[in-house]
Amino acid sequence: MTPSEQNIDKEELAKFSDLAQDWWNPAGKMKPLHLINPVRLKYIEQQITLKGKHVLDVGCGGGLLSEALAKHGAIVTGVDMSESLIDVAKNHAEQQQLNINYQCQDIEILTKDAQRFDIITCMELLEHVPDPQRMIKNCAALIKPGGKLFFSTINRNFKAYLYTIVGAEYVFNLLPKGTHDYAQFIRPSELTQWAESGGLRLLDITGIHYHPLKNEFDLSRDVSVNYLACFTHE
């Protein structure tokens, strides 16, 4: 597969690669990801037991979610297109004495292999790739029958724009400026339609709410900004 055929945005890839050395700093530029990670794990564990399950973490970055999944008994493979992030993930997992299979790999290459997974996570990635529907389709091709896929992304509406771009990037400086592109945000109806076209069935959609006074995230019935979705392949 040539670089022009890959489902990656080179500017997005470079932007997150530049954050690699700060990835595991809970007070650094990736602080929101550190705050949201326990909420992602909580949601996944509400839907399925992790112990002994083979998990593919797509767009694993520096390994925040991959490590959390491994510590809860999952057998984890983490893939990302950023070599610098995969290096950070490998080094940190080694320090923690965790056995995680990290690969700097395009997910489409994995679809040609025989291995299929019980669980696939694709968190905060869809809004950063040129073709999110293609990403969902490839995830669907890698799940076992009856397995569960988890996506998290950002709704596309005025409130989401105010919260995630104006608020998070410019007012509270929770994220580096330019982290998000509003045009790439995804409505739940769009995510569901793309997933169903790939043979998936929606099980649940749950919102993620930020409490500024507590400086923490939690699950919510409000999906107007950040949200998580769980699908299955039957």
UniProtKB/Swiss-Prot annotation:
Q: Name one GO molecular function term.
A: polyprenyldihydroxybenzoate methyltransferase activity
A Gene Ontology biological process annotation?
A: methylation
| Catalytic reaction(s) noted | a 3-demethylubiquinol + S-adenosyl-L-methionine = a ubiquinol + S-adenosyl-L-homocysteine + H(+); a 3-(all-trans-polyprenyl)benzene-1,2-diol + S-adenosyl-L-methionine = a 2-methoxy-6-(all-trans-polyprenyl)phenol + S-adenosyl-L-homocysteine + H(+)
Q: In which pathway does it act?
A: Cofactor biosynthesis; ubiquinone biosynthesis
Alphabetical list of InterPro entries matching this protein? SAM-dependent_MTases_sf (IPR029063), UbiG_MeTrfase (IPR010233)
* Pfam families in the record: Methyltransf_23
Gene3D superfamilies per UniProt? Vaccinia Virus protein VP39
Instruction: State the EC number(s).
Output: 2.1.1.222, 2.1.1.64
Q: Where does S-adenosyl-L-methionine bind?
A: 40, 59, 80, 123
Query: What are the alphabetically sorted keywords of the record?
Result: Methyltransferase, S-adenosyl-L-methionine, Transferase, Ubiquinone biosynthesis
The family database entries (NCBIfam families) matched by this protein are listed as: UbiG
According to its UniProt entry, what is the function of this protein? O-methyltransferase that catalyzes the 2 O-methylation steps in the ubiquinone biosynthetic pathway.
What family is this protein classified in? Belongs to the methyltransferase superfamily. UbiG/COQ3 family.
- Protein name, as recorded: Ubiquinone biosynthesis O-methyltransferase
User: From which source organism is this entry?
Assistant: Coxiella burnetii (strain CbuK_Q154) (Coxiella burnetii (strain Q154))
